[in-house]
């Protein structure tokens, strides 16, 4: 069975892993890094992903970051006259990770397990699945990030019974999950979180501070300057990381703006204490879901065996201190917070292929599901933290006499009124026979699969008429749209490959021109002048083709020149061998006269060295 890769599709960084020899292993990208920035840039119709895209974000306005925050919404970003959905941008990142995996494994990869924040709703999960399809991946399973982290942590500890709290503070989302590990079963007891809280927000408080300080000093608002803002973002991210290891850092941004007197520079020392003061509200926001998850699980903090930190933002000392205070436990530092989620996804891939045995994963739905009933009330059918997959039915009736149809308004959330919850979709059960209110029996059934994706059925028990939908949010993509995007992604991948081949061809041609110059110089006066002239002429023809950028002409002229250079190189070797043969003959005659002395001298030298 072909390999199933595990992908952590993150807000700021992504990571890909695979099972090898019974262990999950992170796959490095072509630059040799184990994580790839979730950044996509467009430049002259060329797409760049990762570090190379992030590096030129300051100068390229067509750079897209943190798109995960828009998954499951109708957000679109316009680039070079074309609108892109979050699914399409995510698919470009996934294609890049898929290519890294294929290069590493030496085989085509078509299947993946992709992780999502535990608190992602149905629309966000569907969007992630669609992104995988657009990237040419069969998404075998969507699993929650904290659950994946627990899988990676617990793979070697299956014989131990443990209660674990996974605290996952990533670049754009926050999740906390409580799990029980016993005999290879990973059971999620409860989960909570905030999909609008992460490392980006910690960067933002530093940016706001820098903007305020600069405005106070120079009366110029840097937040209105797009290029200055990108430089501030880079500086804020670097300062945040620095302050995890040192107590103060220097932020220096020369020529950040200009005033009447000339260029202005931003110079500021940021202390860890100041950063903790600026971000105190964000740290506190992580604790409320932590308390809720513990309460839902029915656990006291003292009952926990381990607290596992996941996500790069958990390196912030104030975050570590807060969770330690809240749980009374020293956080476990035996996992890499940037890689553990991808490793867990790879383990789940191994479970699905049969490479990993004796592991059972029981996850939960993060939010309650139900329908709108009379008076705009939200009636829950499936409570949050219910183990999935699951199915639940309930019988409802009509609200008016002779009602010909019922509207089924499907919702997800925790608030008592429908208007305050997230609409997942609507559908109608029509052609109800005339009957007084309260008489028709309409059974509504919710199914949640192992990916956390919802299917809803409504059935008139009197007539057995049934209507069903797989929930697609208002922002969801139809099958036709996904198929179109798949084809576009494949076409773009082909175009990217073609561009790569073009660059390689030009590089080879340039290298051949350089090599020809060297060979001609070495052969000067040693071969017939006509042959040298022929090589020089072919070289100039290739240079002319390179300047014109005519690819077919470059290829033809390169092949012609290569043949001439090969013939010349053979002559160069023949001459070198002939010269070596002559020198050997002369040396042999000389050695015959002095052989005896040479041997004695060599022996004498060796003995002397040994002493």
Curated annotation (Swiss-Prot):
Region annotation Disordered: where it falls in the sequence: 577-611
Alphabetized UniProt keyword annotations: ATP-binding, Chaperone, Nucleotide-binding, Phosphoprotein, Stress response
Residues carrying Phosphothreonine: 173
Q: Which domain of life is it from?
A: Bacteria
**Family assignment?**
Belongs to the heat shock protein 70 family.
What exactly does this protein do?
Acts as a chaperone.
Quote the protein name from its UniProt record: Chaperone protein DnaK
């Amino acid at each position: 069975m072909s390999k199933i890769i595990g992908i952590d599709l993150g807000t700021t960084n992504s990571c890909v892993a695979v099972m090898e020899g019974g262990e999950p292993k992170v796959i490095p990208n072509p630059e040799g890094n184990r994580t790839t920035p979730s950044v996509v840039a467009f430049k002259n119709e060329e797409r760049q992903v990762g570090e190379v895209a992030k590096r030129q974000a300051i100068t390229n306005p067509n750079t897209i970051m943190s798109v995960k925050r828009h998954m499951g919404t109708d957000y679109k970003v316009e680039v070079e006259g074309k609108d892109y959905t979050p699914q399409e941008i995510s698919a470009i990142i996934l294609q890049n990770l898929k290519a890294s995996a294929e290069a590493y494994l030496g085989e085509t990869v078509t299947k993946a397990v992709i992780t999502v924040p535990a608190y992602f709703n149905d629309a966000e999960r569907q969007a992630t699945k669609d992104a995988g399809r657009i990237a040419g991946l069969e998404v075998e399973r969507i699993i929650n990030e904290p659950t994946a982290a627990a899988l990676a942590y617990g793979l070697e500890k299956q014989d131990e019974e443990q209660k674990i709290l996974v605290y996952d503070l990533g670049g754009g989302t926050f999740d906390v999950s409580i799990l029980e590990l016993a005999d290879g079963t990973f059971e999620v007891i409860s989960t909570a979180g905030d999909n609008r809280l992460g490392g980006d927000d910690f960067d933002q408080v530093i940016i706001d501070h820098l903007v305020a300080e600069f405005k106070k000093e120079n009366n110029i608002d840097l937040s209105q300057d797009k290029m200055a803002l990108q430089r501030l973002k880079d500086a804020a991210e670097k300062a945040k990381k620095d302050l995890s290891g040192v107590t103060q850092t220097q932020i220096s941004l020369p020529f950040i703006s200009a005033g009447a007197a000339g260029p202005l520079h931003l110079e500021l020392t940021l202390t860890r204490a100041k950063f903790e003061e600026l971000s105190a509200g964000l740290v506190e926001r992580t604790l409320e879901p932590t308390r809720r998850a513990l309460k839902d699980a029915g656990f006291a903090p003292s009952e926990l065996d381990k607290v596992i930190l996941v996500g790069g933002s958990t390196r912030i000392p104030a975050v570590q201190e807060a969770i330690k205070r809240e749980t009374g436990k020293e956080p476990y530092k035996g996992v890499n917070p940037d890689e553990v989620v991808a490793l867990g996804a790879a383990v789940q891939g191994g479970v699905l292929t049969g490479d990993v045995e004796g592991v059972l994963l029981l996850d939960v739905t993060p939010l309650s599901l139900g329908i709108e009933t009379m008076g705009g009330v939200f009636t829950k059918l499936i409570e949050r933290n219910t183990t999935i997959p699951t199915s639940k039915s309930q019988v409802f009736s009509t609200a008016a006499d002779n009602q010909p149809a019922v509207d089924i308004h499907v919702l997800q959330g925790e608030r008592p009124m429908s208007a305050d919850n997230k609409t997942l979709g609507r559908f109608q059960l029509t052609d109800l026979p005339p009957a007084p209110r309260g008489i028709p029996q309409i059974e509504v059934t919710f199914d949640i699969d192992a990916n956390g994706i919802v299917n809803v059925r409504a059935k008139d028990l009197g007539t057995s008429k049934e209507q069903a939908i797989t929930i697609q949010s208002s922002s969801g993509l139809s099958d036709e749209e996904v198929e179109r995007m798949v084809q576009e992604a494949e076409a773009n991948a082909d175009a990217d490959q073609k561009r790569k081949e073009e660059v390689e061809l030009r590089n080879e041609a340039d290298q051949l021109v350089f090599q020809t110059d060297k060979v001609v110089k070495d052969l000067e006066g040693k071969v017939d002048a006509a042959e040298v002239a022929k090589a020089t002429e072919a070289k100039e023809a290739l240079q002319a083709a390179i300047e014109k950028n005519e690819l077919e002409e470059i290829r033809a002229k390169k092949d012609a020149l290569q043949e001439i250079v090969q013939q010349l190189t053979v002559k160069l070797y023949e001459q070198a061998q002939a010269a070596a043969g002559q020198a050997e003959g002369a040396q042999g005659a000389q050695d015959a006269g002095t052989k005896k002395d040479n041997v004695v001298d060599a022996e004498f030298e060796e003995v002397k060295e040994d002493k």
